[in-house]
Every structure is written in C-alpha cells, then in structure tokens.
C-alpha cells in the first residue's frame, strides 16, 4: 500500500503539505500521478485542516485512490518560548507550525470519519482511521464508524509497542463477550 500524505502540517508554503489536502485539484493530480506509477493500492491521507473533508476525498477517489486515510495531525503552534520569543520546536526560526496529535484529536478524527462514511459519493470506499487511538476501545470506535483498518503512531511512540498487544487482547475479549467471531462484524455498526 502507498499512502499519499496530502496533509503534512510541517511543510509550509503554497501548494505544500496540508495545503495540498485542501485543494481537490491538487489531490486529484497527485493521486492520478501516483496511480500511474504503481500497481499497489493507493490511500489518500486527508487533512483535518479543512471544513469538509469529503470534497478532497471525493476528488482522490475519482482520480483512482483505492481508499482513504484520516486523520493526520492538526496544524498548530505548540507553544512560544518566552525567553527567545520563538516557537518551540524552533528549527532555524522556520518552524512555527507543527502537527498536534494524540488522545485529544480523537473526537475530531471520529467526526471526519463519520462525515466521510455517510457521504453518498464515498460509499464502499475503504477508510483507514487514525487520530488519538490508544486503546482497543478507541480502535473499536473507528471500526464502528466504518473504518476497515486503523493506524496507531503517537501512542506507540508514547507507550511502546506493548499497547498493540493490549489492543488485540481487549478486542478479542470484547468480541467473545458480545458473541462475535470477527472484528469485521463491528465495522460500520454505528452508522445509520
């Protein structure tokens, strides 16, 4: 799988980073170019720095994306060093913006996943969910809103790979307690 990151908040400049994800024409252009160069499945990673994620998501699918991934980090200024009056982290004075991730972004991620899953033009398009997943319950919520897979990065960086085993164990217990035999039985259950 190739995941096209149309949402990196660390790249600043017109037509770069998360700006790509806000422009359906650029999303379509880069998705089509990627599809032309590979036979691997292509996911378009959407930016949360937008009001209606469905618009660029639809452009990605029309251009050939095999699925969507959401969400990336939220563009932010983490803090200001009150001694130097520069942003932190400061990379040669050129990095005032960064990406905010972790548990706090989960409700935002779920909202965007919900919107895309309900969009008529995106019906049947696989979604890989991410954003604030720390526990099996978090992962299950993304699945319940229609995600076929989930991705976990910040939590692994914070707590180590052990959390993956805990997620698997928790999900197995949940399935058994609820008479289910496959995680696929939870996908989309929270959708109308």
Question: Which stretches of residues belong to each language-model region?
Answer:
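Conserved, mostly hydrophobic/aromatic
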Residues: 4, 45, 68, 116, ...
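Glycine-rich phosphate-binding active-site loops on the catalytic face of alpha/beta enzymes
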Residues: 6-10, 63, 67-78, 132-133, ...
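Active-site glycine- and acidic-residue-rich loops that bind
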Residues: 41-67
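Extended, intrinsically disordered, low-complexity segments
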Residues: 106, 169-192
């Amino acid at each position: 799988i190739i995941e096209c990151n149309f949402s990196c908040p660390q790249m600043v400049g017109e037509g770069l980073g998360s700006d790509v994800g806000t422009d359906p024409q650029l999303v379509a252009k880069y998705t089509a170019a990627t599809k032309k160069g590979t036979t691997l499945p292509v996911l378009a990673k959407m930016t949360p720095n937008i009001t209606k994620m469905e618009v660029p998501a639809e452009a990605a699918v029309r251009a050939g994306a095999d699925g969507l991934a959401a969400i990336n980090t939220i563009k932010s200024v983490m803090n200001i060093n009150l001694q130097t009056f520069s942003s932190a982290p400061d990379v040669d004075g050129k990095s005032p913006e960064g990406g905010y991730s972790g548990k706090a972004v989960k409700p935002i991620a779920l909202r965007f996943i919900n919107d895309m899953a309900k969009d008529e033009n995106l019906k049947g398009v696989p979604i890989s969910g991410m954003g604030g997943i720390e526990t099996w319950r978090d992962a299950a919520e993304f699945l319940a809103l229609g995600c076929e897979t989930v991705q976990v990065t910040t939590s692994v960086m914070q707590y180590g790979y052990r959390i993956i085993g805990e997620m698997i164990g928790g999900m197995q217990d949940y399935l058994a307690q609820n008479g289910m035999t496959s995680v696929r039985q939870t996908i989309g259950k929270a959708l109308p």
